[in-house]
């Protein structure tokens, strides 16, 4: 878990889903999204988080924010999108917490407005993270032949279907349509390259 309030700091190391335990996060400080993206760019590599002799799972990255960026996130986002193949191919989901969250920015970071879910209470947030984590694990264990954005959308839709079984949850899925999705498709799938960090 990478907290980005005043600066960015890892408050939980990389954890498998089976070992993850949710602790309530406290909002505080500013929203240094650029610092968080720079820190993620450093750690999302074979020399840091993705050390394995047996293979790698595609990362699932969940962004949560209750505000709008207070630093220059655009340069950091451009840099991580252009230089980090793990980020580029990761399944990215964004959670807008409360009315003050900048959904447009979260859509840019996740690459698709449909990968953004708005929540307004802690219980819904906890359930969303749990269900999205399990769903992400199941979907990312399949073959990666479709686009990464489609995987995020599939995860969100599956998660929302699971959450809709509980009638008192307050979520909104991809309602704002102002951000343009990033084009992540190309003829080169990048998996055969040796230049992954």
Question: Language model features by range: what are they?
Answer:
Residues 122, 140-197:
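Extended acidic, low-complexity intrinsically disordered regions
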Residues 73, 77-82, 149:
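Mixed-charge (Asp/Glu-Lys/Arg
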Residues 99-160:
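Von Willebrand factor A/integrin I-like adhesion domains
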Residues 1-12, 19-57, 60-64, 70-72, 91-104, ...:
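Von Willebrand factor
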